[in-house]
């Protein structure tokens, strides 16, 4: 939880704005501001390292989709949420840690229609838009959650590539 760090960063930003530029008090406040900024960044880095280590240590095969992060930033709804996290950094950590621990890391192409393909029968529903979160396969009548179905398909694709 980074609420305390965010609160302190905002506090020192306001304080810096009120002080005379490059005065002694300004320099002291600037040091405190950077201290809290570093503390926040260290907590984030630590969380990424813990998560990536957990994933790599507990799974022998790690399959991830190569996400179009630049395209996600163009979406007005997702951009503010994505600015707070660094998916690229997390993926890079998982990649190099999987080499350290001699685990298999497979990255699936971003254009693979993982959420459009039924994980039960293989039917591909082409008219599936991004706002549809659940859908029923017309072929086998299986009800799918978009994200869970995509995860199953990514795993199947990774196992095929082995």
Describe each PLM feature range:
Residues 1-162:
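Positively charged, helix-rich recognition surfaces that bind polyanionic ligands
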């Amino acid at each position: 939880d980074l609420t305390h760090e965010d609160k302190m960063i905002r506090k020192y930003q306001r304080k810096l704005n009120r002080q005379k530029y490059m005065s002694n008090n300004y320099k002291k406040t600037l040091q405190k501001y950077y201290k809290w900024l570093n503390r926040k960044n260290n907590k984030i880095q630590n969380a990424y390292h813990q998560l990536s280590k957990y994933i790599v240590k507990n799974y022998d095969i790690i399959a991830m989709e190569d996400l179009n992060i630049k395209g996600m930033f163009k979406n007005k709804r997702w951009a503010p949420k994505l600015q707070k996290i660094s998916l690229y950094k997390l993926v890079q950590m998982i990649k190099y840690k999987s080499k350290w621990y001699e685990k298999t890391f497979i990255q699936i192409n971003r254009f693979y229609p993982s959420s459009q393909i039924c994980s039960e029968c293989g039917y591909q529903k082409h008219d599936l838009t991004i706002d549809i979160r659940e859908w029923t396969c017309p072929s086998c009548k299986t009800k799918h959650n978009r994200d869970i179905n995509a995860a199953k398909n990514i795993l199947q694709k990774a196992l095929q590539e082995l």
